[in-house]
Amino acid sequence: MPKLGILKSKSMFCVIYRSSKRDQTYLYVEKKDDFSRVPEELMKGFGQPQLAMILPLDGRKKLVNADIEKVKQALTEQGYYLQLPPSPEDLLKQHLSVMGQKTDDTNK
């Protein structure tokens, strides 16, 4: 049967692992159980990776605690993305945003 000239685009997925050593620290990689592009020192500090989820990135506009464009770029360029815990200041801003308040309102 002749080819119809339709190209399937490769969907972008990431596999997210939780650190066994550091709370709220996550490692995103392109393929399940493939840490070949992750530096050895990073893996030592990360501990035993614990599978959190497999996530399609195509069609997604945002992630909860990471910039999706930075994640995609890091996966493409270096093969991994490391998500560190948010700082206390970031947590406050996020909470206030959810509550519909502005940071300036906290001083009233």
Swiss-Prot record:
It holds the Pfam family YcgL. InterPro entries: YcgL-like_sf, YcgL_dom. Transmembrane segments: none annotated. It comes from the Bacteria. Residues 12-96 form the YcgL domain. Gene3D superfamilies: YcgL domain. PANTHER family: PROTEIN YCGL. HAMAP family: UPF0745. This is Protein YcgL. It comes from Shigella dysenteriae serotype 1 (strain Sd197). The lineage of its organism: Bacteria, Pseudomonadati, Pseudomonadota, Gammaproteobacteria, Enterobacterales. The gene is ycgL.
